[in-house]
Design a protein with these regions (language model features):
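Membrane-proximal basic amphipathic "stem/tether" segments
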Residues: 1-23, 265-273
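Conserved donor-nucleotide/metal-binding helix-loop-beta segment in metal-dependent transferases, i.e.
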Residues: 133-167
Length: 273
């Protein structure tokens, strides 16, 4: 943690100029006070290494202070504000199940806030606070361009180690009449408009079996919803290539590394590569 603070102070002092960022693409990340240092560094490394020049917006989990926001402004990053919150809540106030879960489960912001606040953008990117864009990253911008150019909804996820949903992927496929749900992780993806439909999210959350499944594995609820949305017949859903995969132990030669809980202690190693 001491090393992370050293990197944090270095990036805070040197800052980052994001004034020429494209408005057509927005990169979102979600964190609060607890993950602030890591999230701050990940936002810097995205801007330095991803090959994508765009606005970076932190979805505030409600714990970021004015000091945190000032620090983020030093690297050209903005945070969601009260007006954004009102806009988001207005978008779901007629969707009772979505609204209820949004109030109870912070990771629903990865679905709802992204959909509402990316209105008018050609492409959006999402990365968790523990996703690190490495210096070896050289092809990610290609997938951003593909999403921009594709006619119709398209999304790329990084591949998870195994299917990780509120129940088995086979049960989900049967319940929602889907085929071949991808082994995806919703902590890192890039897509164009049209993937998320709030009315369909409400329909999923209204399903009695889905409600029962979430009682046992609620922490992957938003990931499961993304998997269902991305498996609709009108969505072109793909996995990013192997050098973006979530791997345990982490492969330090990958273009990005997703330092999930089991390997988060190795995050500092990625900064030294």
């Amino acid at each position: 943690m001491t090393l992370l603070r050293v990197f944090f102070l270095f990036f805070l002092i040197t800052g980052f100029d994001n004034k020429k960022a494209s408005e057509e693409t927005v990169a979102f990340t979600l964190f609060g006070r607890k993950e602030f240092v890591m999230g701050f560094i990940s936002a810097v490394m995205f801007q330095r290494n991803s090959g994508v020049s765009c606005k970076v917006l932190v979805i505030n989990d409600g714990t970021l202070t004015s000091f945190h926001k000032w620090c983020l402004s030093r690297i050209g990053v903005v945070t969601t504000n009260s007006q954004d919150s009102i806009k988001v809540e207005n978008a779901i106030k007629t969707l009772p199940n979505t609204y209820k879960l949004y109030k109870e489960f912070i990771l629903m912001k990865k679905l709802v806030d992204l959909h509402v606040l990316s209105e008018g953008c050609d492409c959006l990117i999402y990365f968790d606070s523990d996703v690190l864009f490495m210096r070896a990253c050289h092809s990610f911008s290609d997938y951003v361009a593909r999403c921009k150019d594709h006619q119709g909804p398209m999304i790329y996820f990084n591949k998870d180690i195994r299917h990780s949903f509120v129940t088995s992927h086979k049960e989900i496929e049967k319940e929602f009449a889907l085929e071949n749900i991808k082994c995806l992780n919703a902590g890192f993806f890039v897509c164009n408009q049209g993937v998320v439909k709030l009315e369909l999210v409400e329909e999923i959350l209204s399903n009695e079996n889905f409600q029962m499944w979430t009682k046992n594995r609620y922490w992957v609820t938003e990931q499961t919803i993304y998997a269902i949305l991305a498996s609709q017949t009108n969505i072109n859903c793909k996995l990013l290539p192997k050098n973006f995969d979530l791997q345990i132990p982490p492969n330090l030669e990958n273009e990005t590394i997703h330092f999930v809980g089991a390997i988060r202690k190795h995050y500092w190693r990625g900064l030294l590569c």
